[in-house]
Regions:
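Extracellular/lumen-exposed scaffold segments
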Residues: 21-153
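Bacterial Sec-dependent N-terminal signal peptides
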Residues: 1-25
């Protein structure tokens, strides 16, 4: 009976650890597309962070150790990418004098916008993924990848 209690106690600790880790998801993403001109769309990728959490910009200073947010788009012969991804939000420059590093980051929300131009008036989808790292003032979580698909109508 003592062995059974030890096993149950150990199992409870293991599952509790997984449960706590699974709850740490401080960034939520939404994806949408808006027609802005004939055959031209803006795909918006919006990150919303929980209080005290930060998401890093695509562009980081040379002394940064933060992992920048990066997007990968699936090739699609029906459209071409038009310009680079724009970031819309209040960028903060974080400086840590103890470590001698800095980072470009966002709190609360940031919108990434990629313009695309269709080669013809067709329905298609814009697929890809975003890899990002998020931190609060005490810890950073490992990089995470989120896949997405946005209908282009």
């Amino acid at each position: 009976m003592k062995n059974m209690n030890k096993i149950l106690g150990l199992a409870l600790m293991v599952f509790s650890a997984f449960s706590c880790t699974a709850q740490l998801n401080p960034v939520s993403w939404s994806f949408s597309a808006t027609k802005v001109a004939d055959k031209t769309y803006e795909v918006k990728m919006v990150a919303t962070m929980q209080t005290n959490w930060h998401l890093y910009s695509q562009k980081q200073p040379e002394d940064a150790i933060a992992i920048p947010t990066a997007f990968t788009f699936s090739p699609n012969p029906l459209f071409k990418l038009d310009d680079n991804i724009k970031e819309i939000g209040k960028m903060e420059v974080m400086k840590d004098p103890t470590l001698g590093v800095s980072a470009n980051q966002y709190s609360k929300t940031v919108t990434f916008v990629q313009r695309i131009k269709l080669k013809a008036n067709v329905k298609t989808s814009f697929n890809g993924n975003v890899e990002y790292q998020t931190c609060d003032d005490k810890k950073c979580l490992p990089p995470k990848t989120v896949n997405f698909s946005v209908a282009i109508k």
